[in-house]
Amino acid sequence: MQEAAGLRPIKMSASLIDSAYERLVEAIATGSLQPGERLTQEKLAARLQVSRQPISHALNRLRAAGLATGAGRRLVVAPIDSRRLGELYQLRAAIDGLAAQLAAEKISAGNLARELSPWIDILTRNRDLEDVAPTLDWIRADVRFHDAIYRLSCNSVLIDTVEPLWPHFRRSMGNALSEQRRRSHTRSEHRTIANAILEGRPKDAENAARYHVESAYSAAVEAGLTIRE
């Protein structure tokens, strides 16, 4: 049987807890773990080929992030709260707009340190995403693209504010990015944002980033997410 996306075995790494948490978030984002599905330590440990301890810690992080609900052995994937999701996207529109504006301003003024050049490379590469790729690859590319903009803003408070919210955005984009039409829109919108930043046009970058977030939210809703009113 083909291994479910996001639940591949974990290789030994510096932090098994982080790896386990990341795999579980990806599995929820791609729908491999559905809302209401039981999260059993033994089964997840077997799937990821790790001991139960990192799974236990990862499940606690999922619950703290709002992606799992329940207690003890009755932990399940949390349903999507449509009202809260809308509020999260509303906040993200403001944050992403500011991040894109700040990044464009720094590029325009030539104030970016050399160590930030890898983030510029990510913006350049992500302008030309291919339609034909697994949904999980698209989600990862999307996360890298937006993370690059946050890093280029050089605003640590902004980064610390938005990072904890991204597991929810990854979850909402899973269904939307499985559709070719949304992938085409995403690639086009990313290209518009990246061009505005790299050409040092702060206002255009802000507007493009805000539009992209609003478009992403509409696509997530239209994709028919299972939501809790």
Which residues are covered by each model-predicted region?
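Conserved amphipathic alpha-helical segments that form helical-bundle/coiled-coil interaction surfaces
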Residues: 109-174, 187-196, 204-214, 218
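Short linear motifs at protein or domain termini
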Residues: 1-105, 222-229
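Amphipathic alpha-helical repeat elements characteristic of tetratricopeptide repeat
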Residues: 18, 82, 93, 113, ...
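Short alpha-helical transmembrane interface motifs in multi-pass membrane proteins
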Residues: 81-82, 173-176
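Amphipathic, non-transmembrane alpha-helical secondary structure
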Residues: 25, 86, 97, 101, ...
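Solvent-exposed loop and edge beta-strand segments that line ligand/cofactor-binding
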Residues: 178-182
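Short helix-capping and inter-helix turn/linker motifs at the boundaries of alpha-helical repeat units
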Residues: 15, 136, 183-184
